[in-house]
């Protein structure tokens, strides 16, 4: 339905369906005609029904032209070959190619070669027959026969197992482990009690209490859902806001500090927000390894700088008239000391330590570590079946939909064809990073951050791989590109509709949309420039290898 061939990108019917799937996902995620997680379910369903090896019968597409392959086999043997032998080889090759999951000219050539030489390998061919068969096999690698193999129209399908595996991808388990930690912390009031303790050092000066609120919110957001963190902190803040005089603009600063802290804080760890996990997934697939600890080493400094900038912006835009504010005093409670509470405390500490300490010291990667709180909290009854049902499964399904798009892009060879057809060597890597992150930031301002990352990350990962292969970008540059896009996904916070934390803050009635738009736009643009500069610096000093 589009002139792909004229653009230098010849696509087969399956690849056309994958492109249509991307367009469909983009429109549904942007317009939100249905809940965004249900769009992911539809994406996975349509990929199974229309692009996989288990497609509906009327949608099935031949992976290769049987007549062309049969003719190549016959020409390799030559006119003097036994017709029955040729026919048997043609049948064997056809069956083998139908089962192949990664169909390329080299795979076709190797399959025919194996079938032709089978009598030689098994010892059933005499000397004369062996010589003739070796000559036939040799034709596959030179001359007209070899050229015809290279020009075969081959179609690769997505594999059913690969699509279903997105529901239990290691990154999904990593996120699920984060959910278990967050739910356990909330259930045993670890979050509220930690907030009370952490806010004490900030004293009673409203300016520093504001910074304390942003910092504590950001800290919780690194390990909990941004939305859940914002809901908890705004609930704690509501009675405090009532202490402000109606004309005190500082109320807006306190209301806005929560979504800023939640949105920015999630950037600090791989489990802080889904875009981070999605970026990590595609980096791992391409062999660009960034560990949990590595991410925190550049993510947390970025968060700290952004919090200080956000704090400065809020103080300048919304001066605080209130002279004193003892927020810690308003937060009642104490740490629970029940056996299950101690299980939560110890598991929380052990899990975070294992995530932060490099893998070579204990042998577990971040995904494997995530199973520890899942197992411990399940066995000890900290998390019950009721708690499990209440978890944010919609977020996991949304992320799985993004992974399914990546599977379709890779297994149908659309990503490979994209890489081979576009002159990436001529592209400027800095222009690509700036342009793609601006597009991402714009999209994230108006649609779900996770949906934005799920849509852009598979495409940009393929582009990055192409540029690395073309020599116009190195692996650290590719990592920087994906990390910048992940950061940009979380920085879209200029409007009430940008994120649930923004909507919650706006719903308090203490924030005007104009004030949110101005402060959010300034902060997100500064954050984008800072993230690009940070990735450039890390690449220059060899942080990514």
Regions found by a protein language model. Give the residues of each.
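Hydrophobic alpha-helical transmembrane segments in multi-pass integral membrane proteins
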Residues: 268, 274, 350-356, 402-420, ...
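Transmembrane alpha-helix interface/packing and boundary motifs in multi-pass membrane proteins
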Residues: 27-34, 216-226, 259-271, 354-358, ...
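Generic alpha-helical transmembrane segments of integral inner-membrane proteins
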Residues: 23-26, 45, 176, 180, ...
């Amino acid at each position: 339905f589009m002139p792909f061939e004229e653009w230098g990108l010849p696509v087969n019917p399956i690849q056309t369906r994958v492109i249509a799937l991307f367009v469909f996902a983009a429109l549904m995620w942007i317009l939100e005609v249905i809940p965004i997680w249900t769009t992911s379910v539809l994406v996975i369903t349509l990929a199974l029904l229309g692009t996989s090896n288990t497609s509906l019968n009327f949608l099935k597409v031949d992976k290769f032209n049987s007549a062309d392959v049969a003719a190549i086999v016959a020409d390799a043997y030559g006119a003097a070959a036994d017709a029955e032998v040729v026919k048997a080889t043609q049948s064997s090759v056809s069956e083998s190619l139908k089962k192949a999951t990664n169909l390329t000219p080299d795979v076709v050539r190797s399959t025919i070669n194996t079938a032709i030489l089978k009598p030689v390998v098994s010892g059933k061919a005499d000397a004369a027959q062996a010589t003739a068969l070796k000559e036939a096999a040799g034709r596959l690698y030179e001359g007209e026969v070899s050229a015809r193999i290279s020009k075969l129209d081959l179609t690769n399908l997505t594999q059913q197992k690969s699509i279903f595996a997105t529901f239990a991808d290691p990154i999904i388990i990593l996120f699920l482990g984060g959910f278990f930690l967050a739910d356990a912390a909330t259930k045993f009031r670890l979050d509220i009690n930690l907030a009370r303790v952490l806010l004490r050092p900030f004293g009673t000066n409203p300016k520093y209490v504001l910074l304390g609120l942003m910092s504590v919110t950001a800290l919780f957001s690194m390990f909990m859902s941004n939305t859940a963190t914002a809901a908890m902190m705004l609930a704690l803040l509501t009675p405090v806001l009532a202490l402000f005089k109606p004309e005190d603009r500082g109320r807006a600063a306190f209301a806005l500090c929560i979504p800023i802290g939640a949105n920015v804080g999630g950037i600090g760890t791989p489990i802080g927000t889904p875009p981070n996990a999605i970026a990590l997934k595609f980096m791992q697939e391409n062999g660009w390894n960034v560990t949990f600890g590595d991410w925190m080493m550049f993510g947390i400094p970025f968060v700290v700088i952004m919090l200080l900038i956000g704090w400065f912006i809020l103080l300048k835009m919304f001066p605080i008239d209130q002279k004193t504010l003892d927020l810690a005093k308003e937060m009642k409670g104490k740490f629970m000391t029940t056996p299950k509470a101690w299980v939560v405390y110890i598991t929380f500490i052990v899990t975070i330590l294992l995530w932060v300490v490099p893998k070579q010291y204990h042998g577990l990667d971040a995904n494997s570590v995530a199973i520890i709180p899942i197992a411990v909290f399940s066995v000890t009854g900290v998390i019950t079946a009721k708690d499990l049902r209440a978890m944010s499964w919609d977020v996991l399904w949304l992320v799985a939909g993004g992974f399914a798009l990546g599977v379709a892009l890779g297994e149908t060879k659309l990503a490979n064809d994209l890489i081979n057809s576009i002159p990436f060597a001529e592209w400027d890597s800095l222009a690509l990073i700036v342009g793609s992150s601006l597009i991402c930031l714009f999209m994230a301002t108006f649609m779900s951050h996770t949906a934005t990352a799920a849509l852009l990350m598979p495409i940009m990962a393929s582009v990055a791989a192409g540029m690395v292969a073309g020599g116009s970008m190195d692996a650290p540059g590719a990592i920087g590109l994906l990390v910048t896009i992940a950061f940009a996904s979380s920085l879209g916070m200029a409007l009430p509709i940008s994120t649930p934390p923004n909507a919650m803050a706006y719903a308090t009635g203490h924030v005007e949309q104009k004030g949110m738009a101005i402060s959010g736009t300034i902060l997100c643009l500064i954050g984008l420039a800072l993230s690009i500069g940070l990735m450039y610096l890390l690449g220059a000093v060899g942080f990514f290898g």
